[in-house]
Amino acid sequence: MTQPIARSIPLQVVSGDTAAPASLQTGVKQIGGDKINRSPVQFVDAPVLRKPSWIRVRIPSGNAVQNLKAKLRENRLVTVCEEASCPNIHECFSHGTATFMILGEVCTRRCSFCDVAHGRPKPPDASEPTSLATTVADMGLKYVVVTSVDRDDLRDGGAQHFVDCISAIRASAPKTRIEILTPDFRGKGRMDRALEILATSPPDVFNHNIETVPDLYPNVRPGADYQWSLTLLQRFKAQHPTIATKSGIMLGLGETMEQVQATLRDLRAHDVDMITIGQYLQPTPHHHPVMRYWTPEEYKALEDYGNALGFSHVASGPMVRSSYHADRQAAGAGVAA
């Protein structure tokens, strides 16, 4: 059996700068240290763990990646694959698949694990749904994932823009199955408004990531709430019993096996059908450090545990990401393509 690497490392968390942050200009991206330095928590004196042999990404040859990037730029579209520095980008792009990120490239949150830029976003682009639908149809995609940055500046959290994109894709590519990976729509009345809007044109799969165990939320997802995310998933399922719900969790942020298992139980108790479990990788030295690399055997144990809980599909492995092989995950859960 593969031995675990560095079961834990010391981590000192300190409060961020208490001085009032400089005002942000609309559309300006804050990335890396500029973003994390505005976070309410900072990480200091954390040693860097060496990546184990099972954390490896094969870079395929050929022009498929550049061709797809050119098509995206031509239509002024953004993928979370690029913005979040996903390690699977070359594999997915080489197969002509991508997870499209709508509502801009600037997020209103400052999560310590995420490489997407922070700042004050621009207003939604009214032409984006049409551009997205045209690209999906041109690529002949059978399955598409649509996600977004957090848009706490919008009254509905961006729900109407999601619906506009779903409707446009269905008009241009009626056979394409659509998965949406949404933010939490947190805020007074925002979840109610978002769910009401999404009901007008629901997706084939509704995905919202829980990301980590509840005890780590203050350091990993400042601005989010564990129970709020569970409630969002449960309420969508209650409104749409026949639509698959999905969530994802990262490992390596300091959680224990028992905490992960408890989170899986919580997700099933809130009627989540599908789950993805993968290794967190630090995007830059400024982000939350990797506390531990979980072994392939542990991922297999969690897969078995999730299956025993009754998830319709469990994708568990070091390089698994929420939208990685999403079409295969959906097919495994009975969502026809």
Swiss-Prot record:
Gene: lipA
InterPro entries: Aldolase_TIM, Elp3/MiaA/NifB-like_rSAM, LIAS_N, Lipoyl_synth, rSAM
Annotated cofactor note: Binds 2 [4Fe-4S] clusters per subunit. One cluster is coordinated with 3 cysteines and an exchangeable S-adenosyl-L-methionine.
Known catalytic reactions: [[Fe-S] cluster scaffold protein carrying a second [4Fe-4S](2+) cluster] + N(6)-octanoyl-L-lysyl-[protein] + 2 oxidized [2Fe-2S]-[ferredoxin] + 2 S-adenosyl-L-methionine + 4 H(+) = [[Fe-S] cluster scaffold protein] + N(6)-[(R)-dihydrolipoyl]-L-lysyl-[protein] + 4 Fe(3+) + 2 hydrogen sulfide + 2 5'-deoxyadenosine + 2 L-methionine + 2 reduced [2Fe-2S]-[ferredoxin]
GO cellular component: cytoplasm
Segments traversing the membrane: none
Gene3D superfamilies linked to this entry: Aldolase class I (3.20.20.70)
Record-linked Pfam families: LIAS_N, Radical_SAM
Coiled coil region boundaries: none
Protein name as catalogued: Lipoyl synthase
UniProt family annotation: Belongs to the radical SAM superfamily. Lipoyl synthase family.
Cellular compartment(s): Cytoplasm
